[in-house]
């Protein structure tokens, strides 16, 4: 389906120069002189190579329709994730590299959504937030509680996040998987 270049969004799959690309980032740039254009960072689905492309906002681009399927993560087998279809109980292999920076947040039996183009996996979406335990946190400095400063903490999956000063090691917190940021203390 053809669409204007200014409607491209991160996560979409497009066809350009006879190859399929997944859009990683997009930015509309309006220079002081001349017309606006869109700068797109994208990755080749076959080779994994990244490139930047620049189009005028009125240019058209071929967008491929994706089919979203629900799966449950079972285990990792080498460079692949083994996912299970909840309806048919069939196993499905997906390259682990599709997770990118979100890989540390993948947990056993986690529900994930896989984007497919003609049966080929092109992206994986984790839940928006996960609950993890803090294994290391700097102690609170007296007088620091009045300010809105954050302190570094290490999660059980090895990821480092910035947390409020009242959070201590051993507590469970909710973390946003998209950008590894603290959301709140876990309830219960």
UniProtKB/Swiss-Prot annotation:
Q: Which organism is it from?
A: Acidiphilium cryptum (strain JF-5)
Report the main location listed first in the record.
cytoplasm
Q: Which PANTHER family match?
A: ELONGATION FACTOR P, TRANSLATION ELONGATION FACTOR KOW-LIKE DOMAIN-CONTAINING PROTEIN
This chain's protein is named Elongation factor P
SUPFAM superfamilies, per the entry:
Nucleic acid-binding proteins (SSF50249), Translation proteins SH3-like domain (SSF50104)
Keyword list (alphabetical) reads: Cytoplasm, Elongation factor, Protein biosynthesis
> Where does this polypeptide localize?
Cytoplasm
State any single GO MF term. translation elongation factor activity
Q: Mention any one GO cellular component term assigned to this protein in its UniProt record.
A: cytoplasm
User: What the protein does?
Assistant: Involved in peptide bond synthesis. Stimulates efficient translation and peptide-bond synthesis on native or reconstituted 70S ribosomes in vitro. Probably functions indirectly by altering the affinity of the ribosome for aminoacyl-tRNA, thus increasing their reactivity as acceptors for peptidyl transferase.
Q: In which pathway does it act?
A: Protein biosynthesis; polypeptide chain elongation
